[in-house]
Amino acid sequence: MAKYCLKKTSKRVSCAKRYKIEKKVRDHNRKVKKEAKKNGTTNKKEKTISVPNSCPFKEEILVQAEQEREKIKVRQEAAKEAAKIHRIEKRKNNLPANFESMVAKASKQGTEFDKKVASAAEHEKFNTLDDKTIKAYASEVRKTVEIADVIIQVLDARDPLGSRSKSVEDQVLKGGKRLVLLLNKIDLVPRENVQKWLEYLRGQFPTIAFKASTQEQKSNIGRFNSAILNNTETSKCVGADIVMKILANYCRNKDIKTSIRVGVVGFPNVGKSSVINSLKRRKACNVGNLPGITKEIQEVELDKNIRLIDSPGVILVSQKDLDPIEVALKNAIRVDNLLDPIAPVHAILRRCSKETIMLHYNLADFNSVDQFLAQLARRIGKLRRGARPDVNAAAKRVLNDWNTGKLRYYTHPPEQGTAKEDIVVPAEVVSQFSKEFDIDAIAEEQNQIVEGLPMESDIIAPHNSDEEEDDDDEMETDVNEKKQTVTSGRKVKGPTKDDDKPVLPESLALEGNVQLNKLIKTAIKKQKKKSKKTANRADKLSDSLGNMLGGDAMEM
């Protein structure tokens, strides 16, 4: 063992001490550089001029090089002095000479600021409501209504009244055309809600429950028959056969021998192009979850008797009656083009329960919209410089979840005659439309589709705003809004309390169907495996004991 005096001192120090030393070194070096720059001295050594001894004119070359070096130094000093003088003059020119010049400068800056504000307002107007674009889209919709014989208005099943256009319906009725309401996206709402909306809307116009296909292939798009809707999460189309039947009934009852044109209209992003692709069973129109994909009318031949007309989505409402927040919540404007995405989030949090939002995004309790967006920004990693949360990015994330259906919601139909949105349709018109399309003949198939939807308890945890009290003004429930339920589409991960229970077939729950033979065979099989393992262990143990006893006998 080495002597104690020969052992070297360990260089290991604590991290705090090492960081402290490094910080002091940095501060010292910074101070030295600052002093050197102030005094005009530098530690940088000048590069020596080296000339080979074999050169015949070495002395003259060295003298000439020194003279050039001095000239370069003089030019650099002169440039520094000129730059210093220029900075001083510029600083003097920026200072106002008198009160009048100060006022003129302030007015100039105010004019520049007003120009910036005006340009920002024009940019917001362009992103939200472009008058030329709206007029162009509106003319395309009017053209569709004029040339079509039957109009199918596609509604979002989550908010049918919010996606319904009264002006389009008035144009259809004035033109003597036939109108059919198609309730799309029924897989996003519970069964009871769909039944109530069908009952409410059928009192005004013929209404069909529908689910457009979400498959991405170009052809052979799948569809379900109305009687076998057993998977609510399928990407196939549901209800296409019923649409074809009512159109065929209309042609037969009106004795139309030639083809008819069917116009498909509706708000942006309600699924008009997806409905046409589902009926055609191939990708005939471009689709996407962003508004403005369809920019002009497009005619698609369904068969020899039916031609479908796809129209661009537009909200035909006067600009003074148009609420920009409602437009954003209906996905009529691209989320990336919104200059203030936080305002729609206020409306979302007024319509849904705090527990639903906390469960969906896995957040702690919050008392305001700003606090919620700050927590969500940290949760999804949207941070600015200095670890400040990017609330705008978090608000856009919430809007995207709202528009794509991840944050599920649905509205409740109003009572007959109590809603401001009620459209009064004469009873003669309702009965005439029902007879022409023979709605009673497809009632049974419609009921089968609705019965195949999940119950409210399967996917929905309804929020009752009367059971909660919130002291914060920003989180207060908006009583003027339509009755609406918002739920989380987030699935709970991880083990549950029922994981420890044995998994048994569902058929055993039926009375008189216990499958005794199958259970007996399974139990016998497990018992055989267990006895076989026990026998193997006993054999190994006996072999080891025999070897030990044999070795002891040989030694004796």
UniProtKB/Swiss-Prot annotation:
Keywords, ordered alphabetically: Coiled coil, GTP-binding, Nucleotide-binding, Nucleus
Biased composition (Acidic residues): 466-478
Domain CP-type G: 138-317
Region Disordered, residue ranges: 29-50, 461-508, 525-556
InterPro entries reported in the protein's UniProt record: G_CP_dom (IPR030378), Gnl3_N_dom (IPR014813), GTP-bd (IPR006073), GTP-bd_ortho_bundle_sf (IPR023179), P-loop_NTPase (IPR027417), T_Tr_GTP-bd_dom (IPR000795), TRAFAC_YlqF/YawG_RiboMat (IPR050755)
GO biological-process terms attached to the record: germ cell development; nematode larval development; regulation of cell population proliferation; regulation of multicellular organism growth
Keyword Cytoplasm in record: no
Recorded phenotype for the gene knockout or disruption: RNAi-mediated knockdown results in a reduced body length. This phenotype in suppressed in a ced-4 n1162 mutant background.
Name of a matching Pfam family: MMR_HSR1
UniProt biased composition (Basic residues): 525-535
Coiled coil ranges: 58-95
SUPFAM superfamilies: P-loop containing nucleoside triphosphate hydrolases
Keyword Coiled coil: yes
GO cellular component: nucleolus; nucleoplasm; nucleus
Localisation: Nucleus
GO molecular function annotation: GTP binding; GTPase activity
Sequence positions that bind GTP: 184-187, 266-273, 310-313
Family note: Belongs to the TRAFAC class YlqF/YawG GTPase family.
Domain notes: In contrast to other GTP-binding proteins, this family is characterized by a circular permutation of the GTPase motifs described by a G4-G1-G3 pattern.
Role description: May play a role in regulating cellular proliferation in both germline and somatic tissues.
PANTHER family: GTP-BINDING PROTEIN-RELATED, GUANINE NUCLEOTIDE-BINDING PROTEIN-LIKE 3 HOMOLOG
UniProt name for this protein: Guanine nucleotide-binding protein-like 3 homolog
This protein's encoding gene: nst-1
